[in-house]
């Protein structure tokens, strides 16, 4: 039997709104997926197609999240680590080894390594990067459907000029990260 290696990555540390989303993926070495790379290097159409293929072909995968409230309470780094723990612990099997994109590891009891630029180096991290990105983008599309005036489908919650203009006109929703400086500053003005 081969070792079960999980790849983990996060999406959404920089946006002003929504969850930070992480994914853990254990790929099937007998069922390879072509075209895996860092999700940021792929078109949206290709990401969505690959995310579907990953969900179908991976041995196991799971999403972990931390809410805006948790981000505000813990800070973005600790909330991201919490979301990663949730992603891995939510897998139906315990991985033998975990590779995490970046330079930090969560405080957990898994044999693991942090890999800088891991989403370009290891297929399992690339797969995690892709399904986390598609999951978070879908969150923003749903939010856009509820609040089209903010154009969440366009800026995905990131601090763009158009996003700040929408906040100035329509206000700050509950899904905003109130500890993030631009949001905090706007709340203090009120």
Swiss-Prot record:
GO terms for cellular component: cytoplasm; ribonuclease H2 complex. Gene3D superfamilies: Ribonuclease H-like superfamily/Ribonuclease H (3.30.420.10). Residues 3-190 form the RNase H type-2 domain. It is an enzyme of class 3 (hydrolase). It is found in: Cytoplasm. One of its GO terms (molecular function) is manganese ion binding. Disulfide bonds: none annotated. It catalyses: Endonucleolytic cleavage to 5'-phosphomonoester. GO terms for biological process: DNA replication, removal of RNA primer; mismatch repair. Belongs to the RNase HII family. Endonuclease that specifically degrades the RNA of RNA-DNA hybrids. PANTHER family: RIBONUCLEASE H2 SUBUNIT A, RIBONUCLEASE HII. This is Ribonuclease HII. It comes from Alteromonas mediterranea (strain DSM 17117 / CIP 110805 / LMG 28347 / Deep ecotype).
């Amino acid at each position: 039997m081969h070792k079960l290696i999980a790849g983990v990555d996060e999406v959404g540390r920089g946006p002003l709104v929504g969850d930070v989303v992480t994914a853990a993926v254990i790929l099937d070495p007998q069922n390879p997926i072509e075209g895996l790379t860092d999700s940021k290097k792929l078109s949206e159409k290709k990401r969505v197609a690959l995310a579907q293929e990953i969900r179908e072909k991976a041995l196991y995968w799971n999403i972990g999240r931390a809410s805006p409230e948790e981000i505000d309470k813990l800070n973005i780094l600790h909330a991201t680590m919490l979301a990663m723990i949730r992603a891995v612990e939510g897998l139906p099997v315990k991985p033998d080894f975990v590779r995490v994109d970046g330079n930090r590891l969560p405080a957990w009891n898994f044999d693991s390594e942090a890999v800088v630029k891991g989403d370009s180096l290891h297929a399992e991290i690339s797969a995690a990067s892709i399904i986390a990105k598609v999951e978070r983008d879908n969150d923003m599309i749903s939010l856009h459907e509820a609040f089209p005036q903010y154009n969440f489908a366009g800026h995905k919650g990131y601090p763009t000029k158009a996003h700040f203009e929408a906040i100035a006109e329509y206000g700050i929703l509950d899904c905003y990260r109130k500890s993030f400086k631009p949001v905090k500053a706007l709340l203090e003005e009120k």
